[in-house]
């Protein structure tokens, strides 16, 4: 079997790209209403501690003045249990162009959000774990910086990793179904799993150095050589 150097090179390029992705700038704006639950405030405060210098979390009080939303904001979080200011403030944040989610204890507190849209959502929960799991999925659905977000915020890593593994599994399943020559799918699947390995390393804040990436490619090449022997 011919060793697909091109496929392995593609996997390495994907890994280098993933390393760059993990260093992308991430900007999160958090607006805290005076009615916000202390438990929700504490959960978000503990969860949004950046692990790299590429992430920045901006925090501001929600009051009668118009919310200031920087143009580079990736997502905005509004912590509130309902107030007279909430609807107008949220509208202003969305109009500024930032995907916005309101975190509350009950949907009754935020009646103007009836269902999620690409730009606006509501997560209502009194359970810290459930709140953060839902928030992780909500953000991942609305950003193209999944690796950077997960590398910075630990509560997002499981959701991001699950998506990476599922995507690789679906790719390999489709490859296996479409390739009719025995063994011909092996190089493609190996390359996909190398890429997945590098992406998972970045998601968990432990990016592989390029020397280790070439090591992994060498192991894959040796496996292919033995298979073809």
Question: Would you name each region that the model predicts?
Answer:
Residues 159-229:
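Membrane-inserting effector segments that mediate pore formation, membrane fusion
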Residues 40, 53-63, 97-148:
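Canonical P-loop GTPase G-domain recognition
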Residues 45-74, 80-91:
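A short, well-structured beta->alpha microelement
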């Amino acid at each position: 079997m011919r060793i697909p150097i091109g496929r392995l090179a593609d996997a390495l390029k994907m890994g280098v790209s993933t390393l760059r992705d993990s260093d992308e700038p991430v900007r999160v704006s958090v607006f805290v209403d005076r009615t916000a639950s202390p438990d929700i405030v504490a959960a978000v405060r503990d969860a949004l501690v950046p692990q790299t210098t590429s992430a920045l979390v901006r925090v501001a009080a929600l009051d009668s003045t118009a919310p200031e939303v920087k143009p580079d904001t990736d997502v905005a979080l509004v912590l509130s249990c309902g107030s007279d200011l909430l609807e107008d403030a949220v509208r202003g944040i969305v109009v500024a162009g930032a995907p916005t989610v309101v975190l509350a204890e009950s949907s009754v507190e935020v009646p103007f959000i009836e269902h999620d849209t690409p730009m606006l959502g509501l997560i209502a929960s009194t359970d810290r774990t459930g709140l953060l799991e839902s928030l992780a999925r909500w953000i991942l659905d609305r950003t193209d910086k999944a690796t950077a977000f997960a590398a910075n915020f630990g509560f997002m890593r499981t959701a991001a990793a699950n998506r990476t593994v599922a995507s690789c599994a679906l790719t390999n399943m489709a490859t296996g179904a479409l390739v009719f020559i025995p063994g011909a799918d092996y190089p493609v699947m190996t390359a996909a799993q190398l890429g997945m390995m590098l992406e998972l390393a970045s998601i968990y804040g432990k990016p592989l150095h390029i020397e280790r990436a070439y090591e992994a490619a060498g192991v894959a090449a040796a496996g292919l050589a033995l298979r073809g022997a």
